[in-house]
Amino acid sequence: MKRTFQPKNLKKKHKHGFRSRMSTKAGRKILNKRRSLGCNKLCA
């Protein structure tokens, strides 16, 4: 049986990347939350 996770970098960037997070209001909220938590890595 094929595994469910077949990694693709472009798909990852489109879904969870910085620019996709910046493009929506909810995404910007996520970024601000992660900044306030002090995360070194904000996005994928």
Curated annotation (Swiss-Prot):
<dbReference type="GO" id="GO:0005840">
    <property type="term" value="C:ribosome"/>
</dbReference>
<dbReference type="GO" id="GO:0003735">
    <property type="term" value="F:structural constituent of ribosome"/>
</dbReference>
<protein>
    <recommendedName>
        <fullName>Large ribosomal subunit protein bL34</fullName>
    </recommendedName>
</protein>
<keyword id="KW-0689">Ribosomal protein</keyword>
<keyword id="KW-0687">Ribonucleoprotein</keyword>
<dbReference type="GO" id="GO:1990904">
    <property type="term" value="C:ribonucleoprotein complex"/>
</dbReference>
<dbReference type="Pfam" id="PF00468">
    <property type="entry name" value="Ribosomal_L34"/>
</dbReference>
<feature type="compositionally biased region" description="Basic residues">
    <location>
        <begin position="26"/>
        <end position="36"/>
    </location>
</feature>
<dbReference type="InterPro" id="IPR020939">
    <property type="entry name" value="Ribosomal_bL34_CS"/>
</dbReference>
<comment type="similarity">
    <text>Belongs to the bacterial ribosomal protein bL34 family.</text>
</comment>
<feature type="compositionally biased region" description="Basic residues">
    <location>
        <begin position="1"/>
        <end position="19"/>
    </location>
</feature>
<feature type="region of interest" description="Disordered">
    <location>
        <begin position="1"/>
        <end position="44"/>
    </location>
</feature>
<dbReference type="GO" id="GO:0006412">
    <property type="term" value="P:translation"/>
</dbReference>
<dbReference type="InterPro" id="IPR000271">
    <property type="entry name" value="Ribosomal_bL34"/>
</dbReference>
